[in-house]
Amino acid sequence: MAGRLPACVVDCGTGYTKLGYAGNTEPQFIMPSCIAIKESSKVGDQAQRRMMRGVDDLDFFIGDEAIDKPPYATKWPIRHGIVEDWDLMERFMEQIIFKYLRAEPEDHYFLLTEPPLNTPENREYTAEIMFESFNVPGLYIAVQAVLALAASWTSRQVGERTLTGTVIDSGDGVTHVIPVAEGYVIGSCIKHIPIAGRDITYFTQQLLREREVGIPPEQSLETAKAVKERFSYVCPDLVKEFNKYDTDGSKWIKQYTGINAITKKEFTIDVGYERFLGPEIFFHPEFANPDFTQPISEVVDEVIQNCPIDVRRPLYKNIVLSGGSTMFRDFGRRLQRDLKRTVDARLKMSEELSGGKLKPKPIDVQVITHHMQRYAVWFGGSMLASTPEFYQVCHTKKDYEEIGPSICRHNPVFGVMS
């Protein structure tokens, strides 16, 4: 272990990629997961792009640099957590390693993360890119949910370190509810919710557009995003909240000032109901999506009820939040309250149905919030990759050359974690 350079931890999400070195508490770089490529190479499919290899190949930008580059086409290689364009992903990784981390990939072990329900073929592609293109000495592909559970140990609410729990991972593009038992994901019970950070931004944008005319149209999305991040919170009761704003507006209504990108003049808007209506779509999805009407508390309940009966109580007791979209104030408290109501109603009903003969033991419902929530997956990865055992469970270059990319289909669960 001594004298070894720290491992690199890279967590690629739909909206943002978090990267840094193991042992740190937060990622060194957080950047949009996008890549800007030359217009000419945009035309046609991947096969055609391969034909045009050459100088054009080196002409691309990633992250924040890629966002406003007019002659270039901005592409997002990851959709709903899963990599869709491997060519672009390889180029993205190239800049991450050499330009941002400034690392020599031959000298560092790598920990990459994968979303739930990622296919074994995708793991093989990842292994090929890392071992063939970058020649890394070792690679471990960790499941995001397990890392989020490990990160939750920093919370005061956690008494014992356990790898059994329900992870609610809500990022920019997708929200997953993932039950984990003893470090293994119960794949058949995972549910995904088609509401995440981006949907809240769009919904806030819609609300602002109806009411505030002063926002320049081309900036309405970034204004909505800023309003969401700065002012939004989750309220315990919608009707009471509306009354609060109606009776004492000056106390609750906030002001947001932005600068018009074209005229460079300031514009000011009032932010009222949007503050609590944005995140409310987690609990009333029908506000924003007429096709999906199940509140997040019911989804979590359904996921746990689908799991084997002997792990249900521990799953209710350890509900862990992870990802930027769970950062709204009081999100955890509201979720815990709604879920507790659902669970208590079920227990009461079973007692009534038995004619009072059965007295079910109350179920402890606990939603864990902690200050590492936003980068929980990355932080969990950083914790694990700084343990000596990490180097024993990594797949090495030697294994890869002997057996091939299929070695990365399975990544062992750490014993050291719990």
Curated annotation (Swiss-Prot):
The keyword Ubl conjugation does not apply. One of its GO terms (cellular component) is Arp2/3 protein complex. It is found in: Cytoplasm, Cytoskeleton; Cell projection; Nucleus. One of its GO terms (molecular function) is actin binding. Keywords: Actin-binding, ATP-binding, Cell projection, Cytoplasm, Cytoskeleton, Nucleotide-binding, Nucleus. Gene3D superfamilies: 3.30.420.40, Actin, Chain A, domain 2 (2.30.36.70), Actin, Chain A, domain 4 (3.90.640.10). SUPFAM superfamilies: Actin-like ATPase domain. One of its GO terms (biological process) is Arp2/3 complex-mediated actin nucleation. CDD domains: ASKHA_NBD_Arp3-like. InterPro entries: Actin, Actin/actin-like_CS, ATPase_NBD. Belongs to the actin family. ARP3 subfamily. PANTHER family: ACTIN (PTHR11937). ATP-binding component of the Arp2/3 complex, a multiprotein complex that mediates actin polymerization upon stimulation by nucleation-promoting factor (NPF). The Arp2/3 complex mediates the formation of branched actin networks in the cytoplasm, providing the force for cell motility. Seems to contact the pointed end of the daughter actin filament. In addition to its role in the cytoplasmic cytoskeleton, the Arp2/3 complex also promotes actin polymerization in the nucleus, thereby regulating gene transcription and repair of damaged DNA. Component of the Arp2/3 complex composed of actr2/arp2, actr3/arp3, arpc1b, arpc2, arpc3, arpc4 and arpc5. This is Actin-related protein 3.
